[in-house]
Amino acid sequence: MAEWGVMRAIWQGWLFAAMVLAVGGGWATAGAPAEAGRAVPVIYCTDLFHPHDDPDDHFDLATLYAMPELDIKGIILDQGRKQLERPGRIPVSQMNRITGRNVPTVIGLATPLKSPDDKGLDQTPEFQRGVEFIVQTLRASATPVCIATLGSVRDVVAAFNREPGLFRTNVAMVLAFIGEASDPEYQEYNVGLDPQAFVGLMRSGLPVYWVPCFDGGLWQNRGHASFWRASHRALLGKAAPEVIQYFIYALEKEGSEPLAFLSRPVEPERQARLFADTRNLWCAAVLGVMSGREVVRDGGKWTCALPGSDGQTGGAGRKPLFGFSEVEVSVDDAGVVGYGKRPGSHRVRLFEVRDPAQYEPRMVEATAGLLASLGRKGAAASR
């Protein structure tokens, strides 16, 4: 055990040494600020199901839709075979109805990649649509696209392996919620879904904005993970009735017609059950980095704000709750990440909490503000 203690100290030393790397050439700051009136093209990859595995994905989807500057080109539903039985397109159709959008969905590859450079071409045609959609969207976009991935990263890596040049010229960032920041003995759930896809992503050299799910093992956050907890009452206390219905439908694994359910009156007993629950979250307001949003104090409250929306333009006057710092990482064949410059290492941007004491309550407040805007006038323009 003493030997393991030394190894852990060395591992953590790599991390802190890596954090002092100077930001140099070629990398933009996290989340290019959205210009007034200009949408940010986004491909969203998620392991969203109905009935759910974990309804945190429903909160993330709703938060994404609450940011009208994000032009969601399409949603790739992870783990295609499971999608046939438990379709994530159901909550997407509900969010489309609530916001007036018309975002398409496609299902992704069915089985894990066999190697980091696997193109997934041996999988059947019904599961190729996700990879094909990613490639087609990148080709068609006049501006670089942001890709957010919440799940296995399988379809993104297979698409990259088919068209690496296209990715290098037309991907603005890959915002990846996956992995463990500091414990080499712990394999995080999303990595376990497809270890070779994770290896492929971390070796790709793409502009990866890495958001580890944990830092220090299961349910731990030492400052480089996005994990936090919230009560449903705090998140949804000001949400519109159709948004409450959306979450009741998800949490209670409803089987009735999903769009009609949104317009039914909220039943007090079901709302009480919803509000009594709590949720583990990882994404939500963090998704705003794709358009340059930051979780900042605006007067007497914390919001997920676009640049300039709080009277600040960045710099010393604006103190975001979290951000990203550039690090050098390498990853072995088992998906274990090491820090520091070495042969085969690549630069990524690593998530960091800048105010640990305030992180959880302020993430609750900022996410609640976004969710409160859904279903209300001006919350999201049709796209």
Name what the model sees in each region:
Residues 10-26:
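Bacterial N-terminal signal peptides
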Residues 35-39, 44, 84-141, 334, ...:
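Metal-dependent C-N hydrolase catalytic cores
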Residues 37-89, 116-230:
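Active-site histidine-anchored catalytic micro-motif
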Residues 28-36:
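Boundary at the C-terminal end of the N-terminal hydrophobic targeting segment
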Residues 1-10:
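N-terminal secretory signal peptides that target proteins for export/translocation
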Residues 106, 175, 288:
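Residues in well-ordered beta-strands of folded domains
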Residues 95-100, 200, 233-236:
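Short, conserved catalytic or adaptor-binding loops enriched in Gly and charged residues
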Residues 37-40, 59-67, 71, 192, ...:
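Conformational coupling and interaction surfaces
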